[in-house]
Amino acid sequence: MESCWLLTVDTGSTAHGSDNLMLDLQPPSFEAFEREARQGNVVPVVRSVLADLHTPVGAFMRIAGDSTYSFLLESVEGGERIARYSFLGAEPEMIVRGKGLQTIVERDGKTESYLKVATEWVRDYFRGRSLAHRPGLVPFAGGAVGYIGYDAAQWFEPALRDDNTQPLDPPTDAVWMFFRNVIAFDRVKQRLEIVSIVLTEEAGGSHERLRELYDRAVARTKELEDRIFETPAAPRVETRNDNAESVALQSNWTRRAFEDGVREVKEHIAAGDCYQVVLSQRFSAQFDGDPLQIYRALRAINPSPYMFFLRLGDETVVGASPEMLVRCHGQRLDYRPIAGTRKRGATETEDWMLGEDLKTDEKEIAEHMMLVDLGRNDLGRVSDYGSVKVDDLMHVERYSHVQHLETSLRSRLRDGLDRFDALASCFPAGTVTGAPKIRAMEIIRELEPDRRGLYAGSVLYMDYADNLDSCIAIRTMVLRDGKAMVQAGAGIVADSVPEHEYVETVNKARAMFRAIEMAERGL
C-alpha cells in the first residue's frame, strides 16, 4: 500500500490499453447510460481524450480561471514510482461548512443552516446515493473535496467538547466543495478523463428528463474539453522582484513562551500524564500575490505524495503533506504513521548509511512504535476483531529532501460502520497530538495560545462509492486576508531540549515559506 492520493504504479509499467491509440473516446450512448443507471443512481458520463501535451497545473489554470471555488489534487513522487492520477475541478454545485456544532450549506444561490455537525450532514447527504459501477472508471469521479480542521475533533470525542464555551459565531472547522464535474489526468495512458455525473433522482422517474440530464452531462464534458484545448495558455508570470528578501515571519508565541511551554509539557510527562505532546506554533507573513504560484513553487521544491491546492472562497489552502491520515476503499482501511526523519545523502552510500542510522536509532524507534500502537488502536475500534495487520514495519521511505520511518497498517472495516466512523476513530492523527491522544490534546488546548484551525486536521475527498482518502494537514499553508500562515510542531518527550524544539518548529515553517520567496522572485 502506497501513501499518496489514490494509485501509484511502476514507472516501467506497460499498462497502456489499446484505447490509448484513440485520440478521442466519446461518452457512452444514452442506451448504455440507461443500463448503467440500473446499477446505481449516480451515473458517470465520461469523455476520454489524449493529453500528452498538457499538464495538470496548465489544465487547472484553464478550467478554474478566476473561480473562487476549485481544487487540484496531485501526487508528485520521486524514486521508482509515479502517482497515476491527478484530479481537478471548479465551479462546485454546493459548499458545506462546519462551524462549531452547526452546518452551513450554500447551493442554488441560497444559504441554509442546520443544527448538526458537518460530518453527520455530509453522511446523510451521501446516504442512499451510490455510484454505478463501470470497469476502468477513474478512482475519483465526483463527490466532496475539502478539509476538516483539528478543532473539529470535538465532533468525535465528547471529552473534548465544552458546550458552555461554544461561541455564537464559531469559526469554520470544515469546508467541503461538492463537484459533479471532475477532470482526471491518467499518467499511464497519457489521457484526460473528463467526468460529469448525473443524479438520476433528479429525473423524477421521467424518461425524457433523464435524457435531458444525460445530454447536459455530455455537453458539459465537451465544454470542459474545449476549455482545456482551445483556451490560450496562461502567460508566464513575470518576475516581480529579482532581489526579493527572505520572508519576515511572525509567530503567535514568543520564543520564551514556547520554550516555557515545552518545559510544562515535560512536567506533565514526569507526572505520568502523557508520553509525548506535539506542541506547535503558527507563523504568518504578508503575501498579496497569486497563491497558485506558491503551489507551483512548492511542487518544484518539495514534491510530496499528497499535493493539494484548494480555493475556498475567502481563503486558499496550499500543501505538500507526506502523510496519510486514513483511507477507506470498500471495507479496507489503510493507515500509515510516519515518525523518524533523516536528510537525504549526497551520494547513494551516504543515503543508505543515513537510512540505516535512522532504523537503529533507539529514540526514533521508541517514538515510532508508540505511534504505530496508537494507530493500531485507532483502527481496531472500527475494524473486525483480529483484522488489523502490520506491513512494512519501520520501512525507510525516501522523498525528495528527507527519508522517514514509515509503517503500513491495514484492517477490515466492521460491518455496520462506514468511512465516517473510520475518520472519527483516527482523527486527528497521533503523530500531530502525542500520546495518550486525548490527554495530549487537553494539554495542547491548555498551552497553545490559539485554536489550531486546519493545522493537524485533514485534507480529504469522499466519493459516491463510499470511498475516502485523506492526508494530515501538515506542511500546509493557509492564505487569507493578505497573509500566509503556516503552523509547525515538535514532538516533546521526556528528554526534549526546549531550545532545540523551538528551532525545529522554525525550520519546518521556514521550509514552507521558501515557496513564497520563490514565487515572489518569479517562476
Give each language-model segment a name.
Residues 21-523:
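Extended alpha-helical targeting/anchoring segments
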Residues 7-10, 219:
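N-terminal non-cleavable signal-anchor helices
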